[in-house]
Amino acid sequence: MKQIIIDPRLKYNYASWYLLGIKRLLKGWKIVYDVSPFKGIKYKNTADYNSGFAFIICSNGQKKKVFVDTEDVAKIFEDRYEWCDVYGMVNPTKEQVVQYDKLIAIGPEFGVTLGSRFSTIIRCLKLFLKGRKYSSISFKDYLRDYLYTNIRRRPIEAYECETKVRHNYIFHASTLWYNKFAATDTNMYR
């Protein structure tokens, strides 16, 4: 049986892009959210929660453990790297790509809305209950992350429409950051 097992303790806003990809690319595969195979990955604080998410690809009697690191900083989470067979990373350095054999540079991603606000709340509640024994993240923080996709993100269809190409125009999508450093540096370049 072809199956994807996903750790329910994922940061939904950052994982939504990849969840959409899994759903679209692996049509017909069974998708299961289960914390059991991921108990060894600790989620004790916000940094752990923000690190990314794990899933296992089961096909033809073989299993491949994948961790997707969605952090903006070029930091390898060693415990997650040791756990997985493939470590996908959004922002690695050239040196990291050479040094870490399991590391694959996957490029940027962005959060997308995957359903109505009601269905998102139901999904949040279900996945929180599945992973709560193995996470210190509060339900309030978990729910805030899920609802962020409905409040601040758009469905993928909003990005897939035909558009006229303007030769003197560069498309850039990002969110302004709300901290002291961002006000003086990052946001100025956005």
Language-model segment annotations:
Residues 1-77, 81, 92, 172-187:
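N-terminal pre-catalytic "stem/leader" segment of glycosyltransferase-like enzymes
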Residues 56-185:
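Catalytic core of nucleotide-activated saccharide and alditol-phosphate transferases
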